[in-house]
């Protein structure tokens, strides 16, 4: 019997470049660990938890056979890990094929908020360096304050 999926499954997207394309800045081995290890692990982890949720909904798991708070924490962790790695891959480019200062509206907004791109880089780097252990720093637009935040 084929069971209908209640939730769309996450997929590991292809890298937008070859694994060695970021050398000498990021080695092929590090890209491989992050892509085939971490990123793939987040996708598989999210999908395994979605399968568990489907079993709960279908009544295949009884009370006491699952921890809904743990499942929600796991989904949050794995889905965020997947989405952040997807952003990570798309935010980088091989040498000579990207990077540098942004242009257009983003450049204008950074200039307005930070005074200069160099000042933005300093603030962003400070935010990244202040994280305990390992973690992510991302630039995002806060619609409530109409400012960029990291």
Please give the residue ranges for each predicted region.
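Feature for soluble, non-membrane regions of globular proteins
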Residues: 1-150
């Amino acid at each position: 019997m084929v069971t209908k999926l209640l939730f769309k499954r996450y997929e590991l997207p292809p890298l937008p470049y070859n694994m060695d394309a970021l050398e000498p800045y990021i080695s092929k081995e590090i890209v491989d660990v992050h892509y085939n290890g971490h990123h793939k692990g987040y996708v598989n982890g999210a999908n395994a938890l979605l399968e568990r949720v489907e079993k709960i909904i279908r009544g295949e798991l009884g009370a006491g056979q699952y921890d809904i708070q743990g499942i929600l924490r796991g989904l949050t962790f794995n889905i965020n890990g997947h989405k952040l790695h997807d952003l990570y891959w798309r935010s980088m480019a091989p040498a000579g094929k990207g990077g540098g200062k942004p242009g257009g509206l983003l450049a204008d907004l950074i200039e307005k908020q930070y005074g200069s791109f160099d000042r933005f880089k300093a603030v962003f780097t400070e935010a990244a360096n202040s994280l305990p252990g390992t973690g992510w720093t991302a630039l995002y637009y806060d619609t409530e304050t109409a400012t960029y935040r990291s």
